[in-house]
């Protein structure tokens, strides 16, 4: 499993409730750009529109070798492929309980298909983010102390 892009900001801003795997509909030029590692999920988000699920605002750069006929939209909406039951479950959670869906990463699976890891998440408050930073800092200091002890 080769990870193409990871959304680190989502892990900081949201507490992850549940993870899902989804296929993604891409054009040929987008797949070539992903193989070159030209993707960014920083500001991306997921929406359910007419019982179909889309990844919006994800950035896949154009390669300079791509012919103008085959060029894709860099920040276009990309359809995600999931089972109907999973989409309905996500729709119920998002509409009623105040959760959101975020894209965590893009990767090539063992069959060389591009997959996206989605997460059902709830936004963190400012004090939760501070607590996460404090915990991370304490873990780093503990590791450094253990390293120096040996």
Swiss-Prot record:
Which protein are we looking at? SsrA-binding protein
Check the record and name the InterPro entries matching this protein. SmpB, SsrA-bd_prot
GO terms for biological process, alphabetical = trans-translation
| Entry annotated with the keyword Lipid biosynthesis | no
Q: Which residues does UniProt call coiled coil? A: none
Keyword terms of this UniProt record: Cytoplasm, RNA-binding
Example of a GO cellular component annotation carried by this entry: cytosol
The molecular function terms in GO held by this entry are: RNA binding
The record ties this protein, via CDD domains, to: SmpB (cd09294)
Sorted alphabetically, which Pfam families does this protein's record hold? SmpB (PF01668)
State the function annotated in the UniProt record. Required for rescue of stalled ribosomes mediated by trans-translation. Binds to transfer-messenger RNA (tmRNA), required for stable association of tmRNA with ribosomes. tmRNA and SmpB together mimic tRNA shape, replacing the anticodon stem-loop with SmpB. tmRNA is encoded by the ssrA gene; the 2 termini fold to resemble tRNA(Ala) and it encodes a 'tag peptide', a short internal open reading frame. During trans-translation Ala-aminoacylated tmRNA acts like a tRNA, entering the A-site of stalled ribosomes, displacing the stalled mRNA.
The family classification in the record reads: Belongs to the SmpB family.
Q: Which domain of life is it from?
A: Bacteria
Location within or outside the cell: Cytoplasm
